[in-house]
Amino acid sequence: GDGPGDHARAASTFLTGSHPYKTHGAEIEAGVSVDQVLAKRLGETTRFSSLEIGCERGAQAGNCDSGYSCAYSANISWNTPTTPLAKEINPQLLFERLFSAGTKGEILEGRRKRQGYRRSVLDLISEDARVLQKRLGSKDQSKLDEYYTGVRELEKRLMLSSREIKTLPGVEKPPHDPEDFGEHMRLMADLMVLAFQGDLTRVATFMVGNAGRNR
């Protein structure tokens, strides 16, 4: 072995099966994680080849565990042996990434307009949805209704959550410090389920907390 550093070592080994190179510098190296192996096979026909989500951002450099880089503690998904894939930890941003299109600025502007008019992202595709409904059998119509209901309910929860975490007018708490960690975790998990149900992706990783944390 190479001494202490079990938390970082375990996290980086979890999906790669590789012993990471012990460093807190830039020369990090672990292995390709199994989710990315699957993503290359299963992700060609979906909007997202894979999703990497979590509830804590974590640093990508520096000494986080007895000489091991923070990149080892904060990531379980590795695209190459030297390239960890950072997690999306903000449920609102993940929702918009899944269900909106356009540049980041266009997505943010669309969010502001929808919230101002109290509209859902599904309102933007209502006509297409009605056309699709007519083409489906009763069972498929029921499934589609169930999916749309899930999206609407989750959107409402996200709006409520974003209002609750405001500390000052126009200022939100940092996304790595949610007001209610349990609800934050449930929102991310539900978004992952919707992504699977909508066949937006077939591969996802969910890292609830960074290695060595007491979550």
Where on the chain are the PLM-derived regions?
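Ligand-binding pockets and gating/stacking loops
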Residues: 1-215
